[in-house]
Amino acid sequence: MFDHRILEILVCPLTKDKLQYNKDTNELISEKAKLAFPIRDGIPIMLIDEARKLEE
């Protein structure tokens, strides 16, 4: 289970912008960087190399 309060402190490591939680994919989305960071076992993986690139 993902704790939404974490969105108040986490930012995109690339752009430093706020993130959005996608419930369907269980990812944190950076709209500006067009990256989706996975959440594994309730832990956001905020490594750029682990992020999935979003389609244009």
From Swiss-Prot:
Pfam families: Trm112p. GO terms for cellular component: cytosol. It comes from the Bacteria. Belongs to the UPF0434 family. This is UPF0434 protein ECH_0194. It comes from Ehrlichia chaffeensis (strain ATCC CRL-10679 / Arkansas). The lineage of its organism: Bacteria, Pseudomonadati, Pseudomonadota, Alphaproteobacteria, Rickettsiales.
